[in-house]
């Protein structure tokens, strides 16, 4: 990954963080941990999912979901979600979130 790619990723993560903080004020970006990454954001008390953020011109949804799933396992949580850049807008709430249908159902309808 080039420095330019890292800069784009960091910029995207930083742009999305305020939207997350609206709901979870103590959320923060995580430091990179190599193969032991646990998602791109730390959200205190969140034990259901991690978020992997992507800002690429070409989409690789299956690859990104695989990475998010691996990082969820590293964080000992059941689900990985991908936030990815929507071209043509910088509004953090207009970016995309991708997950498996099972993840969506588990998050929307959690077991009691």
Indicate where each model-derived feature is located.
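Catalytic phosphate/metal-binding cores of nucleic-acid and nucleotide-processing enzymes, i.e., regions
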Residues: 1-112
